[in-house]
A protein has these predicted regions:
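Structural signature of tandem alpha-helical TPR/SEL1-like repeats
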Residues: 1-6, 33-43, 70-78, 109
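Hydrophobic face of amphipathic alpha-helices that form TPR/SEL1-like repeat modules
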Residues: 6, 21-29, 33, 58-65, ...
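Short helix-capping/linker turns of helical repeat alpha-solenoids
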Residues: 7, 12-16, 28-30, 49-52, ...
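TPR/TPR-like alpha-solenoid signature
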Residues: 20, 57, 77-78, 93
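Alpha-helical, heptad-rich or low-complexity scaffold/stalk segments
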Residues: 61, 75, 82, 97-99, ...
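Terminal, low-structured helical/coil segments at or just beyond the last alpha-helical repeat
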Residues: 86-122
Length: 122
């Protein structure tokens, strides 16, 4: 419907909030959209890359659970850590769950890589 068209137009113009809404729309088949996980991930990535913690959290959770996407604990840890740093309170519990099931060396490697990325971006 009309709301879907407006959100998609705003998302295409680069609004992170609209990109997150469009991602959610496809993830849960809202506003008359057909459920499309690949499309949801595409829009979540656009919003997450702009630093939106809710999109980073959504991506991390999807990757952690492997629902509609290949489960990837390393990528999930990266997105959830970014979401946490950017203010997502909910990310912490999911990070704790990942820490329990991941190899400590893998977690250290991810944290080192994220620190390097932050230094090169800063």
């Amino acid at each position: 419907g009309r709301a879907r068209e407006l959100y998609i137009a705003a998302a295409q113009r680069g609004s992170a909030k609209a990109q997150y809404v469009v991602g959610t729309m496809y993830r849960f088949a809202q506003y008359g959209a057909t459920r499309d996980i690949a499309e949801a991930v595409k829009w979540y990535l656009k919003a997450a890359d702009q630093g939106m913690p809710t999109a980073q959290f959504a991506l991390g959770r999807m990757l952690m659970e492997g629902k509609g996407v290949v489960r990837d604990d390393a990528a999930a840890m990266q997105w959830l850590s970014l979401a946490h740093v950017n203010g997502s309170k909910r990310a912490e519990d999911y990070i704790k769950t990942l820490l329990k099931r991941m190899d400590p060396a893998e977690v250290r490697a991810i944290r080192d890589r994220m620190t390097e990325n932050a230094k090169s971006a800063g």
